[in-house]
Amino acid sequence: VQPPPVHDWDVPVLLLDMSKFMNDSWDLTLVRLIPFLNGTSHVRRIAQLADADVLLVKQCVQHLLYYSFAMLIDIFQFSNIYVLRPQVAPMLSDPHIESECASYVMLPGCDALPGPVLWHMYSMLRYGRTLHDWIGLLGNQVQAVDVRRFITFGVIKGFVRRVHQYPIYSSYQKPLRNSVDTL
């Protein structure tokens, strides 16, 4: 099974702490990339930061995808729209996921929010509502949360997905004249 193609704009997210597995036999390009695979930088930026050829970076990321050490997510923007997926239902009653989420998404120095508050915040993600609008709607609740990590956690766990919106061109057709218009 081939890993999916990797594009310049894809953002790789490591699913494991790769520094624990590194040894002298690793590919040198991959060793240079690991510090920059932070879930925020896109492939082209990682290549610039690591001073590596972008094609080699793509190949390394493909290897990480093949072995399920990483996954690709979209570039984070506050104009993005995200929604909950049905896969959230079994997670609502899992205390391990709840505590993992709280520790992953909280800003340093802030107390962890209780699980029901986090799930309420996720439930406020809607079609047509940008992250910017979502933050405005939730107000003070979001101040203790790293929004990028909040969304990334949901995407990694599979219960949040991005809604892609594309403009559609439809040719304008002049309305037909009827007898009422000519009077």
Which ranges hold each PLM region?
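Long, compositionally biased, serine/threonine/proline- and charge-rich low-complexity regions
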Residues: 1-2, 152, 164-168
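Hydrophobic packing positions characteristic
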Residues: 1-19
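Fold-level signal for large, globular catalytic cores of enzyme and receptor domains
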Residues: 16, 21-29, 79, 85
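Short helix-coil junctions and helix-kink-helix linkers
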Residues: 42-54, 120-145, 183
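Basic amphipathic alpha-helical segments that dock to polyanions
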Residues: 46, 61-67, 134, 150-158, ...
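A short, conserved structural fragment
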Residues: 65-76, 155-166
